[in-house]
Every structure is written in structure tokens, then in C-alpha cells.
Swiss-Prot record:
GO terms for molecular function: carboxylic ester hydrolase activity; palmitoyl-(protein) hydrolase activity. The lineage of its organism: Eukaryota, Viridiplantae, Streptophyta, Embryophyta, Tracheophyta. This is Probable carboxylesterase Os04g0669600. It holds the Pfam family Abhydrolase_2. It comes from the Eukaryota. It is an enzyme of class 3 (hydrolase). One of its GO terms (cellular component) is cytoplasm. Belongs to the AB hydrolase superfamily. AB hydrolase 2 family. Possesses carboxylesterase activity in vitro. One of its GO terms (biological process) is fatty acid metabolic process. Keywords: Fatty acid metabolism, Hydrolase, Lipid metabolism. The active site is at S113, D167, H199. It comes from Oryza sativa subsp. japonica (Rice).
Length: 235
């Protein structure tokens, strides 16, 4: 499932959380980019395949890869072969967009929950610097041993990470640890923490997300802008 046709536009690939669909995400996110000045931003909302999830009692739901446990903690180990297969699918979408003529600096990979985990894994292993990666209530689904596999160009992609401190599905510690790891390896990761927020998207996050995308597209480059801090930002 490819992204929008090429041209002088910003491209946002949005990866939903497990149990959701791309159309559900579209209904929630797309209205924030409906203003005329954002008409150049094109979204893609693919839907994950379905599979039986043992930790949900064998329920068949959409999922990008296996879910080993709930809640997800900073120590949760994922089936990395499955994660990498999902990453390959995302890379195919990105390759298609670049081949169609879109500048990598205008491409953003974003996601919620498991989709956020897949987004950051995909960006870290992609051989080009992208416009950015945005993680909502996600985690890092690969062990730290994969750090040596991160291309130098991927390390230049800026990251924005949102996480609620009341999240009971993907614990706050998992998001905090993921962003801290990115900073340890020299990446720009802005972390937005929300004390009362659970495992969901809220208006404040989406408004900040919209402005973040606008700022980067106005630059025409994926490098961080001076106004964004790579320090932990407690809301």
C-alpha cells in the first residue's frame, strides 16, 4: 500500500496502533491538516494485517507484529524477526515514494502505540535522513544491540516523542527509555510528557504535531530547528 503520488508535497505515513485501522486513524488525524495552508501535506494511513494475539486470549486483531505482553515495559522483548519484517514493508513504501520523486526530507513516519514502535524502528534502519519521525505512546521494539546497524544518515532524522505518564498499556518508562536511547546515540529526540494522559491521543498532542510538521516543511530540510529542545519537556 503506497503513499500519495509524488510532487512538491510533504508526505506523512501514519501507522495505527494494534486493533485499529488506517481509516480510524484518518478520521482522527486528518482534520488537523485540513486548513488551506496545509493542503500540500499528503497522508497515507495503511492498515496492518490481522493475526491472533495470545496475550489477548487469542483474539484476532490488526497488528504490525506480535504483542508479547501487556503492558509493554522498558524491558519487554519483542520478536525481532517479526519487527524487521514489518520494517521491510514500511521501507518498501518509503522507497516507492522516494523513487516517485519526493525528497526524503519531506517524508515523515509517524505512529501510535505499536504503530509508533514500528515508525521509530523503520526510521532508525532506513538508509536516508527523513524529515522526521513522530511517536505517540510508543516504545523501541528492538534491543540496544541493533545500534551498530543504524545508518549514519538515519541518525540525522529528528524525532518527536509523546507519552502519557498515566499510560497503562505502553508504560511511560518504555517511552522515556526509548527517547533516552536515541539521545545516547546522538540523535535529536524531543520528549513531551503528559502527567494525566493515558494510552490515547489528545488535542494538545495533535496540535503540537501539526506545528512540528509545518516547521520542518517550511525549512525544506530534516535538520532540527533551534526552537526545539532535545531535553525532556514535562507538560
Amino acid at each position: 500500500m503506497g503513499m500519495a503520488a509524488a510532487g512538491g508535497y510533504g508526505r506523512v505515513l501514519w501507522l495505527h496502533g494494534s486493533g485499529q485501522t488506517g481509516e480510524e486513524s484518518r478520521a482522527q488525524v486528518a482534520p488537523y491538516f485540513a486548513a488551506p495552508e496545509l493542503a500540500s501535506v499528503r497522508f497515507s494511513f495503511p492498515t496492518a494485517p490481522t493475526s491472533s494475539i495470545p496475550c489477548y486470549g487469542g483474539e484476532v486483531i490488526t497488528a504490525w507484529f506480535a504483542i508479547p505482553e501487556v503492558p509493554i515495559t522498558a524491558r519487554t522483548a519483542r520478536d525481532e524477526k517479526e519487527v524487521l519484517k514489518a520494517v521491510e514493508r514500511v521501507h518498501e513504501m518509503l522507497d516507492g515514494e522516494v523513487a516517485a520523486g519526493t525528497s526524503p526530507s519531506n517524508i515523515f513516519v509517524c505512529g501510535l502505540s505499536q504503530g509508533g514502535a514500528l515508525a521509530i524502528a523503520s526510521v532508525l534502519l532506513y538508509p536516508m535522513t527523513l524529515g522526521g519521525c513522530v511517536v505517540f505512546s510508543g516504545s523501541l521494539p528492538l534491543s540496544k544491540t541493533f545500534a551498530e546497524s543504524i545508518p549514519s544518515e538515519a541518525r540525522k532524522t529528528p524525532v518527536l516523542w509523546f507519552h502519557g505518564m498515566a499510560d497503562g498499556v505502553v508504560l511511560f518508562e518504555a517511552g522515556h527509555a526509548g527517547c533516552a536511547f536515541l539521545q545516547e546515540i546522538g540523535m535529536h529526540c524531543e520528549f513531551k510528557a503528559y502527567p494525566a494522559l493515558g494510552h490515547t491521543l489528545v488535542d494538545e498532542e495533535l496540535q503540537y504535531f501539526r506545528q512540528w510538521i509545518k516547521d520542518r516543511l517550511s525549512q525544506g530540510t530534516g535538520v532540527p530547528v533551534p526552537s526545539l529542545s532535545d531535553k525532556m519537556d514535562l507538560q
